[in-house]
């Protein structure tokens, strides 16, 4: 078999695999995250939320933002990689994926640091106004990441390619990238910096 034939098989295989995997993730994710939000809403009045609970609720909300886009991707791959929805939904799906990824990383980082503070400085942590700090830090995280993700709304997210399985053309979503774009370079630098910053925080808190 020729090399290009192998890549074609791999490409076709994802149209079967991804809808199945995404469907499982969607069902389990909605149930699990919905249950977490229900528990917090029922058992903990909002005024009694401490810092760690605030971070956990925000982490759950970030996951839910990603989950609501999965039906779009399921339909996309079921249609052989053809985006049948309006273009702005492709931009929105990419934006929410970015937000989920980096909000999750950020909130896992601050949760780790919160536990580090609780273990190393229990008295000072207990006396601090952690609820106010948790709300403020959560707002900073959301504003920073949503601001960076807003770039996805101005991207040319879709492109038209010939349909390899038949006649006509199909529309791809985020499957082509412009080269030499300064904004793309900036966003990639932000991604790498953010990841390693949080990674170092988590590593430090677990090793010290």
From Swiss-Prot:
InterPro entries in the record: GPCR_Rhodpsn, GPCR_Rhodpsn_7TM, PAF_rcpt
This protein's encoding gene: PTAFR
Transmembrane portions of the chain: 17-38, 55-74, 92-113, 134-155, 185-205
Cited Pfam families: 7tm_1 (PF00001)
One GO BP: G protein-coupled receptor signaling pathway
Keywords tagged on the record: Cell membrane, Chemotaxis, Disulfide bond, G-protein coupled receptor, Glycoprotein, Membrane, Receptor, Transducer, Transmembrane, Transmembrane helix
Any one annotated GO CC term: plasma membrane
Protein name: Platelet-activating factor receptor
Glycosylation: residue positions: 169
Disulphide linkage map: 90-173
Entry GO MF terms: G protein-coupled purinergic nucleotide receptor activity; platelet activating factor receptor activity
Record function comment: Receptor for platelet activating factor, a chemotactic phospholipid mediator that possesses potent inflammatory, smooth-muscle contractile and hypotensive activity. Seems to mediate its action via a G protein that activates a phosphatidylinositol-calcium second messenger system.
Organism per entry: Macaca mulatta (Rhesus macaque)
Cytoplasmic side: 39-54, 114-133, 206-208
Superkingdom to which the source organism belongs: Eukaryota
Membrane topology term: Multi-pass membrane protein
Family: Belongs to the G-protein coupled receptor 1 family.
Main location, first listed in the record: membrane
Keyword Hydrolase: no
Complexes and interactors: Interacts with ARRB1.
Extracellular side: 1-16, 75-91, 156-184
Presence of the UniProt keyword Membrane in the record: yes
Compartment list: Cell membrane
């Amino acid at each position: 078999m020729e090399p290009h034939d192998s890549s074609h098989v791999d490409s076709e295989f994802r149209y079967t695999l991804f809808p199945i995997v995404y469907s499982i993730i969607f069902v389990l994710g909605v149930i699990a995250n919905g249950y977490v939000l229900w528990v917090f809403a029922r058992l903990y009045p909002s005024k009694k939320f401490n810092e760690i609970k605030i971070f956990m609720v925000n982490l759950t909300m970030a996951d839910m933002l990603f989950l609501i886009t999965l039906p779009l991707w399921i339909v996309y791959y079921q249609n052989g990689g053809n985006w049948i929805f309006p273009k702005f939904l492709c931009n929105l799906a990419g934006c929410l994926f970015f937000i989920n990824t980096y909000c999750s990383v950020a909130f896992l980082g601050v949760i780790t640091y919160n536990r580090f503070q609780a273990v190393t400085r229990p008295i000072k942590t207990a006396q601090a106004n952690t609820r106010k700090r948790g709300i403020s830090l959560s707002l900073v995280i959301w504003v920073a990441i949503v601001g960076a993700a807003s770039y996805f709304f101005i991207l040319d997210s879709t492109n038209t390619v010939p349909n390899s399985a038949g006649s006509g053309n199909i529309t791809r979503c985020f499957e082509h990238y412009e080269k030499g774009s300064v904004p793309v370079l900036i966003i990639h630098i932000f991604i790498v910096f953010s990841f390693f910053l949080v990674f170092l925080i988590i590593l430090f808190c677990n090793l010290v």
